């Protein structure tokens, strides 16, 4: 009888040990995608793309090659389209956006774009054209300057001091980001990863300082990419930091770097 009790106890200990090891393995897989898995490939692809941040001198894009699909003509070196935009909607108020987009043409080595201020209608989520302000800009010597006279000194100064996220963003600790949610569509091909960030994250602190984001809520990071996962060149890379997302109250920051055919 005593022998049976000891045997039962031994079996129970073995089963418990196997169960604990299984849980640890599942937890580790959730935090760190298994090497060779689609999740690991997605994270590796983003890691290669984000490794180029920051590019402090935008003129470096003239020498940077991107992912070319069938839409590119043979003699077209391509154009980089970079965008950064902050979206704010205080509780119970109108949603407003302000940001810039710049077309960096590798054929002509010229860069032109727009600085845009918009109001978004809450009823249909569309831009209120009566409230939209659009200013043409160009890049000269890594500096953004208006191409037309601007009487509003505040806006003029904002344009001249504008920095794209790609110029100051830093993802050197991206490999340490854990518990990501991944998706992949091989037909497009497009893929994404979502992470919960902390307030001490470098990029979060930069955005709070540059755009006066006062909320203490920890943001979510959404990464969206396009192109061949195995290709080392950048095709399309979208970044979104969501600080607040509620009905009638929103704060988020959008940034994108995209390689497109020249017009």
Swiss-Prot record:
Signal peptide as annotated in the record: 1-22
A single Pfam family it belongs to is DUF576
What are its GO cellular component terms? plasma membrane
* Xref: PROSITE patterns: PROKAR_LIPOPROTEIN (PS51257)
The listed locations are: Cell membrane
- Covalently lipidated residues (S-diacylglycerol cysteine) read 23
User: Origin, by domain of life?
Assistant: Bacteria
Q: Where is the lipid attached (N-palmitoyl cysteine)?
A: 23
- Membrane topology value: Lipid-anchor
- Give the Gene3D superfamilies listed for this entry: 2.50.20.40
InterPro entries linked to this entry: Csa, Csa_sf
- Sorted alphabetically, which keywords does the UniProt record give? Cell membrane, Lipoprotein, Membrane, Palmitate, Signal
Per the similarity annotation, which family is this?
Belongs to the staphylococcal tandem lipoprotein family.
Instruction: Please state what the protein is called.
Output: Uncharacterized lipoprotein SACOL0482
Origin organism of this chain? Staphylococcus aureus (strain COL)
């Amino acid at each position: 009888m005593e022998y049976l009790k000891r045997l039962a106890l031994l079996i129970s200990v073995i089963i418990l040990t196997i169960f604990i090891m299984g849980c640890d393995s599942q937890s580790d897989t959730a935090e760190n995608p298994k090497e060779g898995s689609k999740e690991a490939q997605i994270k590796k692809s983003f890691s290669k793309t984000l490794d180029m941040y920051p590019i402090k001198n935008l003129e470096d894009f003239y020498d940077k090659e991107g992912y070319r699909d069938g839409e590119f003509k043979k003699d077209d070196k391509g154009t980089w389209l970079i965008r950064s935009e902050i979206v704010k909607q205080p509780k119970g108020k109108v949603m407003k956006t302000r940001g810039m987009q710049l077309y960096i043409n590798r054929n002509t080595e010229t860069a032109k774009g727009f600085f845009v201020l918009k109001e978004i209608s809450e009823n249909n989520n569309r831009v209120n054209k009566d409230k939209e302000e659009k200013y043409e800009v160009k890049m000269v010597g890594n500096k953004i300057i208006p191409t037309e006279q601007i009487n509003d000194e505040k806006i003029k100064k904002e344009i001249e001091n504008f920095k794209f996220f790609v110029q100051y963003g830093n993802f050197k600790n991206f490999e340490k980001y854990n518990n990501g949610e991944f998706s992949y569509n091989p037909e497009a091909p497009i893929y994404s990863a979502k992470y919960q960030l902390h307030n001490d994250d470098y990029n979060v602190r930069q955005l709070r300082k540059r755009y006066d984001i006062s909320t203490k809520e920890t943001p979510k990071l959404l990464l969206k990419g396009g192109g061949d996962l195995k290709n080392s060149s950048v095709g399309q890379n979208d970044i979104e930091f969501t600080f607040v997302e509620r009905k009638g109250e929103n704060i988020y920051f959008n940034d994108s770097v995209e390689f497109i055919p020249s017009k």
